[in-house]
Structures are given as C-alpha cells and as structure tokens.
Amino acid sequence: MKRIGVLTSGGDSPGMNAAIRAVVRKAIFHDIEVYGIYHGYAGLISGHIEKLELGSVGDIIHRGGTKLYTARCPEFKDPEVRLKGIEQLKKHGIEGLVVIGGDGSYQGAKKLTEQGFPCVGVPGTIDNDIPGTDFTIGFDTALNTVIDAIDKIRDTATSHERTYVIEVMGRHAGDIALWAGLADGAETILIPEEEYDMEDVIARLKRGSERGKKHSIIVVAEGVGSAIDIGKHIEEATNFDTRVTVLGHVQRGGSPSAQDRVLASRLGARAVELLIAGKGGRCVGIQDNKLVDHDIIEALAQKHTIDKDMYQLSKELSI
C-alpha cells in the first residue's frame, strides 16, 4: 500500500486532530503517502482531497475540533453516490481509507467496504456509543467539560437552595449523563437506556428535602426527553425553586484531555497498521486498556449497552 486517505465525519469530538496526526505520521513513517479528505463524505464525493505532509499535522494534537472539518452527508447512503466517492479515491491513487467518526461514519465505511474499498473505522464521538470499544475519542474530554459545568452549577444551586435539571448530550446513549452524574453526586440520573418513574423522582427529591437537603442536581441525557418539561413537572409537583440548564455544544469543544490524546494516537496508528496488513473492513478500539480490532460489519450489528452495575451504584449512592 502506497497511499491512504483519512477523513472525519459526523459530529466532531475532541481528539480527532490527535487521531489525524497519528494516521499521517504513522503512515509517513512507513513511506506511505496520506491524503486528507475535507468535510467528510461530502468532500469525498466532491473531490476535496489534498496531500498531507508531516507539517500539515504539526501543532494540532492539543486542539479541539478537526483540521479536516466535518459534515453530515445523508446522500452517501445511495450506492451510486458512494461509487462517485470510490472513483475520487481511485483518481487520487488512494488504496485504503481511515474513517474517524461515530455510528453514521461507520455505516459509510461499512458500505464502502461492501463495495470493495478497504476502510478502517476509528471511534470518534463524545457519546461513547460505538460497539467494540470501551471508550471513544472525545468522551473523556466531554465528560470533564460536563463535570466542570455541574460543579459550577452546584455552587449556585447551593447558594439559592434550588433544584437544577441539567441536560447533557446523548440521544441514544446515556454514558455522559451516567458518568458525570456519578462523578458529581447527582441526586437523580435519567438516561435513554433505563425507564424511569417521574413520581419516584419527585418522591426522592421530597425525601431529601425532609432530611434538610437544600439543593438537588438532576442530570438528564437529551434522549430521555425535554429537560425543560421535566423541570416544570418537578417544580409543579414539589414547589421547589427549579432551574434548567442545557449544556449543548460546549460539550463537543475544547482542548482534548490527556486520555483522549493518547487514545486517539493509539487508535489512529493502529488503523494504519491494519491497512498496511491488508486488513480493511475493520474498526479499532480499546478494551481492558488493550488495542483491539473487529470486523466493522459485525461490530455494527452489536448494540451499545450501558454499564448496569454503574447505573445501580449511582442509584444506591444518591439515596
């Protein structure tokens, strides 16, 4: 293999630049040329492809976002559109592709693989919802961003004796909410994977108030429903002074944590190794702190699951 491509797709996550850097430097170390594909699959279709050198990825390991930009490209689901992308890859002499992104990005890589073009997926999403890996690139940074925000909100919640409902990202996965809620001692954590009884939530808040608790923190993953509606329901049912904070896209930004930089470097380099070995159609991950790779088609057939023990622990510690 003499030439590979790399792209980032879907929602950005802190650490993507570190992964790009690792792909480029690992490949060049093995005398392989690297081409960056800008704006994800949309740039692949349009041919926005440029050669990357060592200097192209200098001074980016500590930067959030993605140097290659990103975009969503629903039209890539069309086989004819994907063929245009493959034509662009072949036009530039690219023999293998590293795709950094989340579930949708993996779906694109899977489809390209099924159409005969070797791809390796690298998990880049703050949601931590990709099967085949314990952690995704960006999750740790986003988690620390959320924890920092909740710490600050707790200060003002204490001062004003208020209940705060804090919405975090996670349409289908509650990892951010669960980990942040446990780390910050939230009174209640609501996630898409677990059903909840609003009356039970209210009863828990009332019990806390009866024993002298002056404030409460409720962490809600966006996939559960409207945090605003939940806040209104709580205030009406308890008469507690209640506020709602939606953290939004601040969770996707910022300089990546040390953990995300190291994880991205390891996974990006491993993706190149797989392409060199002729092992396309794979996705890389980290499990028990060891690098692993899986068939991308088989990985996508799996379902992300929440850590049930951690969820139970969060309930036991929030009594």
UniProtKB/Swiss-Prot annotation:
Pathway info: Carbohydrate degradation; glycolysis; D-glyceraldehyde 3-phosphate and glycerone phosphate from D-glucose: step 3/4
Enzyme Commission number(s) from the entry: 2.7.1.11
Keywords: Allosteric enzyme, ATP-binding, Cytoplasm, Glycolysis, Kinase, Magnesium, Metal-binding, Nucleotide-binding, Stress response, Transferase
Signals that turn on the gene: By salt stress.
Catalytic site: D127
Domain of life of the source: Bacteria
Binding site for Mg(2+): D103
Main location: cytoplasm
Location(s) in or outside the cell: Cytoplasm
Residues binding ATP: G11, R72, C73, G102, D103, G104, S105
GO BP term, example: fructose 1,6-bisphosphate metabolic process
Known catalytic reactions: beta-D-fructose 6-phosphate + ATP = beta-D-fructose 1,6-bisphosphate + ADP + H(+)
Binding residue positions for substrate: T125, I126, D127, R162, M169, G170, R171, E222, R243, H249, V250, Q251, R252
Sequence similarity: Belongs to the phosphofructokinase type A (PFKA) family. ATP-dependent PFK group I subfamily. Prokaryotic clade 'B1' sub-subfamily.
Function of the molecule: Catalyzes the phosphorylation of D-fructose 6-phosphate to fructose 1,6-bisphosphate by ATP, the first committing step of glycolysis.
Protein name: ATP-dependent 6-phosphofructokinase
Source organism per UniProt: Bacillus cereus
